[in-house]
């Protein structure tokens, strides 16, 4: 199984929608079902890399994305997910998620707030102990931030649905 063969077999395997194992040069036909251990990996297009953070359906608490979040991530991908939760749960069926590794983006600031404001269910927003550069946000600011975020999400949803 040399590199040339790997490439050929891998391409063939991709065409039939299988999963290629480079160590054995074998192709396993893969049926993608929305089962309890389905994981979505990052997809790349020419224009934009869309990172799908920790979207293992076997770890529902970590699911912090729906279509609208995808749109935001396309343009502003940073740590918009719970990294610890991600590390613990992003190994469904051995799938590896590069997004779950430590990233080199700043640990605080806008995306830190986003990560803490997004709740997995229902598009509600919750700001617990949100800190920006070591300073806690006042409840008034949290409320304003949540409102601005909801308006933005609503606006984006309207565009997507139009």
Curated annotation (Swiss-Prot):
Region entry Last Cys-1 repeat, spans: 32-51
Organism (species): Chironomus pallidivittatus
Tissue: Salivary gland.
Region spans: Last constant region: 1-31
Region (Unique region): 52-162
Major location (coarse): secreted
Record localization: Secreted
The keyword Nucleus belongs to this UniProt entry's keyword annotation: no
A GO CC term assigned to this protein in UniProt: extracellular region
Identification of the protein by name: Balbiani ring protein 2
Function: Used by the larvae to construct a supramolecular structure, the larval tube.
Keywords: Repeat, Secreted
